[in-house]
Curated annotation (Swiss-Prot):
Residues 21-33 have a biased composition (Low complexity). It comes from Emericella nidulans (strain FGSC A4 / ATCC 38163 / CBS 112.46 / NRRL 194 / M139). It catalyses: Release of an N-terminal dipeptide, Xaa-Yaa-|-Zaa-, from a polypeptide, preferentially when Yaa is Pro, provided Zaa is neither Pro nor hydroxyproline. The gene is dapB. It is a single-pass type II membrane protein. Keywords: Aminopeptidase, Glycoprotein, Hydrolase, Membrane, Protease, Serine protease, Signal-anchor, Transmembrane, Transmembrane helix, Vacuole. It is found in: Vacuole membrane. One of its GO terms (cellular component) is fungal-type vacuole membrane. Pfam families: DPPIV_N (PF00930), Peptidase_S9 (PF00326). This is Probable dipeptidyl-aminopeptidase B. The active site is at residues 743, 820, 853. One of its GO terms (biological process) is proteolysis.
Length: 906
């Protein structure tokens, strides 16, 4: 804890005890953060007292000097005159003393009154990354408007009709080059062919403007998507059109239902058909005919075919498709989802009508209610089954998997077509700690359990529902006598890349190993040369570099510069001979197209260098970032500290902790980023600290899995321990420490405040928090907590329930979107009820109508961050100390009368 000599000019109070309301705000040890707040205070005082800078006890003369009961009967005229002269002398002395004290106050290292425009001494003693010590102040509006976001290009690679590698799709408004065109990297990016000449196309008197395009594999047709309407996070409905490249004309996907809203459409690998979903039913349109064939007929509100329901879209596939064509186009695999047993949760919309339907006359003033099939922890899950459709026979069929989990205990997390009608299917139990891999043969209609792993016995952890398995076909001439597949497995406590061959072999060839992890591996495979490309954290958990390794596990080679900190992502061409390499930080991001055909990569073209961003950054004063480690209970955790541009180690700075902290997540990394935390550090002048505690990703399974069954506990310990470490630093004001987060970070904010009980953190800001994990969806929650039926004590412990502990904080803020379909408002309302029952009042709450989890409706996103910033300023200014336990302010004259007449009451 900080010693008293740090602040000898003011009274030291416990961080969890509000100041007496009788004390003046001028001698509060938490007053005065910024010039703006001082000016606002002065405006208020001018309006109420008509005098600035005087102690409140000295201001009553201008307002109440002649008020009845002001003691004039006790004094003669002469004594009154002497008293006035004496009083003015006291006033002048007080004013002078106050001014001197104020000057000393702001020159002795207090960070309260600093704003971005103040000239502070620059610290040149350290070497920190990406800071600029001079320049214009960063504004919140600039951060929110995205002016500091790097420009980036998402390349859509496409395989040529004859197997050509290095082709990519470009779309633009250049009529001369063509609106949608194929460029050939092998020919220096020259246009290989034009698919759409113009950015619009006419169909039966309608002008169609594409919002997205999907060329067929043979590049003779283009699927045009228009009139998109968002459904959930990844899903949408739209109008679909088939565009013919040769004639430059288009027709509806379903000529007999032009206005039907389509949820998904996928090309056959042979380019001769399109599978699509409408109203939760799966259809097939062969291009040889205008006829649309229904594959399923009973889809609707309870049954989904080919598209996921809410929970599978959100928590398993992170996308809008559960439909897969076989490589030869002869079969379609798809998931049937039965939601009939899943309870509904109502989401209300008071200002908007997401359904697009107008209410009946007289019902305009009632909210629209959207009933969502949402399985909460412990509630019935949707039943999922894998089905197949034989295109030639027109038959839907299933293949029994006798060793699979029961319907109410099964999650299908990945489906991969292999060769000759074989399919790899990965499933887990409901609690996601037992993995089963099946090999399904659609020709013999038999299945085989080829791999099973009990992760709970291995390390007490869980299986993440990733979709990264890659089929490797046999090629004896290339040293691959059997089919196989690549998968990420747990190996010696870390996630590593494994090669299983033949398909039914449960013992893999390990391609990587060590105290580091592969990330969504493999990224690409060069089947000709037998090379696997992947991104990994081999250099540091906060970095991402590109590597390659041979299929026998030899010759692991970095392909990016590992001598410098770096964070890279990559997008490969179909044959893995070319790639879009994206450098994302810590310096200004850039993108280049590289060739991987030699022993070393070759840069073919820089497609983005973000020169404008580099010039913009040079004009602004941005925070420095200090990356370091902290060891807690034997675990090494990653920390980044953002310091104000003019950091002065002789000053005392407030500290804001920012976190997300969800299982497997990462917030501390080396990407370039100018965000809300940057604004807080650069323009509000606070230090911002982020620590990825236990439970987060890329630091090994032991640190990640320790949280299972009791999420929030160890994560809070790590936040508190790190905060205590920072509180001891000579440049930190330990009496002004706050923490904030959104979603899981909102939960962690409240859990940390609850566990800390005001000892370290005084303030917190929680946006869209989970407050009881029984309220969140089953697939996510049970992966980390088991079911409530199996772990009732764990759920009790993780809920925000200790109101006395929250009361010990100075104040906290809770924000929630009223129409959040992800983290329901039920969470915050339940917390408020607990606070009410415990008579806890030291909090603020703000709801945003019709906003979902991202809080965007009607300017809400800007308002959220403005609210967070202003609330934080008030916190570190000491406003929440001064507003605690408010009492009516009696007149100065009445207080003077009480001093003169101790018995005065009225």
């Amino acid at each position: 804890m900080r010693s008293s000599e740090d602040r000898e000019d003011s009274e030291l109070l416990p961080a969890n005890r509000p100041r007496s309301p009788s004390r003046s705000s001028y001698d509060s040890d938490d007053s005065g953060l910024s010039v703006d707040s001082i000016l606002e205070e002065q405006k208020y005082n001018a309006a109420t007292n008509e005098t600035l800078g005087l102690p409140q006890e000295m201001r009553y003369h201008d307002e109440e000097g002649g008020e009845a009961g002001s003691n004039e009967a006790l004094h003669t005229k002469a004594s009154s005159s002497r008293s006035r002269r004496l009083l003015w002398l006291v006033v002048l002395l007080c004013c002078g003393g106050w001014v001197v004290a104020f000057v000393l106050f702001i020159t002795q290292g207090r960070a309260d009154y600093r704003t971005a425009t103040d000239e502070l001494q620059s610290d040149n003693s350290g070497s920190f990354s990406d800071g600029t010590s001079s320049g214009k102040p960063l504004t919140l509006q600039q951060v929110l408007s995205g002016v500091f976001l790097p420009r980036g290009h998402a390349i859509s690679w496409v395989a040529g009709p004859d197997g050509e590698d290095g082709l990519l799709i470009e779309r633009g408004e250049d009529d001369e080059a063509g609106y949608l065109r194929i460029n050939d990297i092998r020919q220096d990016g020259k246009v290989n062919r034009v698919l759409m000449q113009k950015p619009t196309v006419g169909v039966d008197g309608r002008t169609i403007k594409p919002s997205a395009t999907r060329p067929s594999p043979d590049l003779k047709k283009v699927l045009i998507i228009s009139n998109q309407e968002k459904n959930w996070r990844h899903s949408f409905t739209a109008s679909y059109w088939i565009f013919d490249v040769e004639t430059q004309t288009a027709e509806p996907l379903d000529p007999n239902n032009i206005d039907g809203r389509v949820q998904l459409a996928l090309w056959s690998p042979k380019s001769d058909a399109i599978a699509f979903v409408r109203d939760n039913n799966l259809y097939l349109r062969k291009l040889s005919s205008e006829r649309v064939v229904p594959i399923t007929k009973d889809g609707g509100e309870q049954l989904f075919y080919g598209v996921p329901d809410w929970v599978y879209e959100e928590e398993v596939f992170s996308g809008n498709s559960v439909t897969w064509w076989s490589e030869d186009g002869s079969q379609i695999a798809f998931i049937r989802t039965n939601e009939s047993a899943v309870p509904e949760f109502p989401v209300q919309y008071f200002l908007s009508r997401p359904s697009g339907k107008k209410p009946q006359p007289g019902l305009e003033n009632y909210p629209e209610v959207r009933e969502i099939k949402y399985p909460k922890a412990g509630a019935p899950n949707p039943f999922v089954n894998l089905q197949f459709y034989d295109v030639e026979q027109g038959e839907v069929f299933s293949v029994d998997t006798p060793d699979d989990f029961d319907d109410d205990d099964r999650l299908i997390i990945e489906v991969i077509w292999a060769a000759k009608g074989k399919v790899l299917v990965r499933t887990t139990n409901r609690e996601s700690d037992i993995l089963k891999v099946f090999l399904v043969d659609t020709e013999s209609r038999e299945s085989k359990l080829i791999r099973i792993q009990d992760i709970s016995e291995l390390d007490g952890g869980w299986v993440e529902p990733t979709q990264s398995v890659r089929f490797i076909p046999a090629d004896p001439d290339k040293g691959r006598p059997f089919d196989g597949y690549l998968d990420t497995v747990v190996h010696e406590g870390y996630d590593h890349l494994a090669y299983f061959t033949p398909l039914d072999n449960p013992e893999p060839i390990m391609l990587t190993s060590g105290e580091w992890e592969v990330v969504d591996a493999p990224t690409a495979v060069d089947l000709t040369r037998g090379l696997v490309y992947f991104i990994a954290t081999k250099e540091a958990p906060t970095e991402r570099h590109l590597y390659r390794v041979r299929l026998d596990g030899s010759d692991l080679t970095p392909l990016t510069d590992t001598s410098q900190p770096g964070y890279y992502s990559v997008s490969f061409s179909d044959g893995a001979g070319y790639a879009l390499l994206s450098y994302q930080g810590p310096s200004i991001p850039w993108q280049s197209i590289i060739s991987t055909e030699g022993e070393k990569t070759t840069t073919l073209r820089i497609i983005e260098d973000n020169t404008d961003l580099s010039k913009l950054v040079a004009q602004y004063a941005l925070p420095t970032e200090n990356y370091q480690n902290i060891t807690i209970d034997g675990f090494t955790l990653q920390v980044v500290e953002r310091r104000p541009p003019h950091f002065n180690p002789a000053r005392k700075y407030p500290v804001l902790f920012h976190l997300y902290g969800g299982p497997g997540s990462q917030t501390v990394d080396r990407r370039f980023n100018v965000d809300f935390q940057s604004y807080v550090a650069a323009s509000l002048g606070y230090i911002v600290v982020t620590v990825d505690g236990r439970g987060t990703g890329f630091i090994g399974r032991a640190a990640r899995c320790i949280i299972r069954g009791n999420i929030g506990h160890y994560e809070a310990i790590d936040q508190i321990a790190t905060a205590k470490n920072w509180a001891q630093k000579p440049y930190v004001d330990e009496s002004r420490m706050a923490i904030w987060g959104w979603s899981y970070g909102g939960f962690m904010t409240l859990k940390t405040l609850e566990q800390d009980a005001g000892e370290t953190f005084q303030y917190g800001m929680a946006v869209a928090p989970v407050t009881d994990w029984r309220f969140y969806d089953s697939v996510y929650t049970e992966r980390y907590m088991h079911t409530p039926q199996h772990n009732p004590t764990g759920y009790d412990n993780t809920s925000i329930s200790d109101m006395a502990a929250l009361h010990n904080n100075v104040r906290f803020l809770v924000i929630h979107g009223a129409s959040d379909d992800n983290v329901h408002i039920q969470n915050t309302l339940t917390l408020i009820d607990k606070l009410d029952l415990a008579s806890v009042q030291n909090y603020d709450v703000h709801f945003y109508p019709d906003s979902d989890h991202s809080i965007f409706f009607h300017n809400a996103h800007t308002m959220v961050y403005e609210r967070l910033a202003s609330w934080l300023v008030n916190a570190f200014n000491g406003e929440w100390h001064r507003t605690a336990n408010p009492v009516p302010d009696e007149s100065m004259l009445r207080r003077l009368a009480k001093r003169v007449w101790p018995g005065f009451a009225h």
